[in-house]
Amino acid sequence: MSTFRQEDVEDHYEMGEELGSGQFAIVRKCQQKGTGMEYAAKFIKKRRLPSSRRGVSREEIEREVSILREIRHPNIITLHDVFENKTDVVLILELVSGGELFDFLAEKESLTEDEATQFLKQILDGVHYLHSKRIAHFDLKPENIMLLDKHAASPRIKLIDFGIAHRIEAGSEFKNIFGTPEFVAPEIVNYEPLGLEADMWSIGVITYILLSGASPFLGETKQETLTNISAVNYDFDEEYFSSTSELAKDFIRRLLVKDPKRRMTIAQSLEHSWIKVRRREDGARKPERRRLRAARLREYSLKSHSSMPRNTSYASFERFSRVLEDVAAAEQGLRELQRGRRQCRERVCALRAAAEQREARCRDGSAGLGRDLRRLRTELGRTEALRTRAQEEARAALLGAGGLKRRLCRLENRYDALAAQVAAEVQFVRDLVRALEQERLQAECGVR
């Protein structure tokens, strides 16, 4: 963000007469206190709210100041200082007091092509410097081509008003609708990408007017003018160009080309034979024709200043440009929506592909699970069979155990019976033995 001096400009400069005004700017002559140096103070009305159409936005002011601070060329106005207050940004600029070039030429009794090219060469030099820095002026027109001092032997051209100038960045697309309808290029009218080539078209229009005093595309209405520009509807009327050289016409033809890429560049224009050749055979031209051309230029200059208030056409065109800016913003929003839609579609496709891959993996997993399940079922069947067999064997074993138990009980009963019988027999034997013993004893006693 550019920083401007937050001081009262009138503490440093004494303000004088008004030199000119536009839709949102007033230019006043001023004198620096202490040095007595004279400058031009351009008061630019700031836009208070982003949504407002009144005033100039901060971004636009900073862009103009940034460009003016960067450029230093004999044929371009110089920025001296910048102040800011609550309502305005004030540019302290070089004082260009010689008036407009066309007014100066209109005052001349006659005008030769050589004189015209001398001034045009200065315009081309200034534009060449701008284009070397990738800066497009975008508002080249007679009232922005001034003389530093019209009383000098060789008056110096000064290009002024960089309010809509832009840096043309490589790789970035820039579109806008601005400028003065009579001088704008077809790509501006048709809202197409803009570049340095737009300035070259304006130079072609300026040259046409300079040599004829007529405007090539000017219609009865602004819409007719814009239609003529878009269709490149112009010709070299014999009434205006009877004394104009073919080289001059060729120079104009190479500039008034609809396709910007086929239009002559600033470097090519400086190398054009009409600009390079300084001396011409003026004897072949009739002096009265040259006087007539100067008179027509005078008529054009008077008409351009008196037919309507200054910058009215620009104001209307700017309002139209605001509408197109809104349309452009809507188109940009639509493009963003379409881009978002494409991104959503791409995401849906990616999600669908991921889902299909997951489904395929699930199918593969399901097939594996099916195989495992079948294997488990087989194993389970085998286990069930083994369990059934084991149960049957257990039942058989239990049944066998019950039989054995019953046999054991019977054996135990038989054992008990035999034991009782044996015990009785043993007792009998014991009794028998005892009886026999007694008998033996009695027998022995009897013997004695």
From Swiss-Prot:
Q: Where is the signal peptide?
A: none
Reaction(s) this enzyme catalyzes, per UniProt: L-seryl-[protein] + ATP = O-phospho-L-seryl-[protein] + ADP + H(+); L-threonyl-[protein] + ATP = O-phospho-L-threonyl-[protein] + ADP + H(+)
Q: Which domain of life is it from?
A: Eukaryota
One GO term of the cellular component aspect?
A: chromosome, centromeric region
- Residues found modified as Phosphothreonine: 180, 225, 265
Cellular localisation: Nucleus; Nucleus, PML body; Cytoplasm, Cytoskeleton, Microtubule organizing center, Centrosome; Chromosome, Centromere
> Does the record bear Phosphoprotein in its keywords?
yes
Q: Altering residue 429 to A: what's the impact? A: Decreased activity
Q: What is the effect of changing residue 422 to A?
A: Decreased activity
- Which UniProt keywords are listed? Activator, Apoptosis, ATP-binding, Centromere, Chromatin regulator, Chromosome, Cytoplasm, Cytoskeleton, Kinase, Nucleotide-binding, Nucleus, Phosphoprotein, Serine/threonine-protein kinase, Transcription, Transcription regulation, Transferase, Ubl conjugation
Query: Where in this protein does the record say Phosphoserine is found?
Result: 304, 306-307, 313, 321
Residue ranges of every copy of the Protein kinase domain listed in the record: 13-275
How's its activity regulated? Answer: A sequential activation is proposed: autophosphorylation at consensus sites is leading to dimerization of the catalytic domain and activation segment exchange (producing an active confirmation of both kinase modules in trans) followed by phosphorylation at Thr-180 in the activation segment and at other regulatory sites. Phosphorylation at Thr-180, Thr-225 and Thr-265 is essential for activity. Inhibited by pyridone 6 (K00225), a potent, ATP-competitive inhibitor. Phosphorylation at Thr-180, Thr-225 and Thr-265 is essential for activity.
Q: What does this protein do?
A: Serine/threonine kinase which is involved in the regulation of apoptosis, autophagy, transcription, translation and actin cytoskeleton reorganization. Regulates both type I (caspase-dependent) apoptotic and type II (caspase-independent) autophagic cell deaths signal, depending on the cellular setting. Involved in formation of promyelocytic leukemia protein nuclear body (PML-NB). Involved in apoptosis involving PAWR which mediates cytoplasmic relocation; in vitro phosphorylates PAWR. Regulates myosin phosphorylation in both smooth muscle and non-muscle cells.
| Other comment | A species-specific loss of a key phosphorylation site in murine DAPK3 seems to direct it mainly to the nucleus which is proposed to be compensated by the interaction with PAWR to maintain at least the cytoplasmic basic membrane blebbing function in the apoptosis pathway.
- The molecule here is called Death-associated protein kinase 3
Source species? Mus musculus
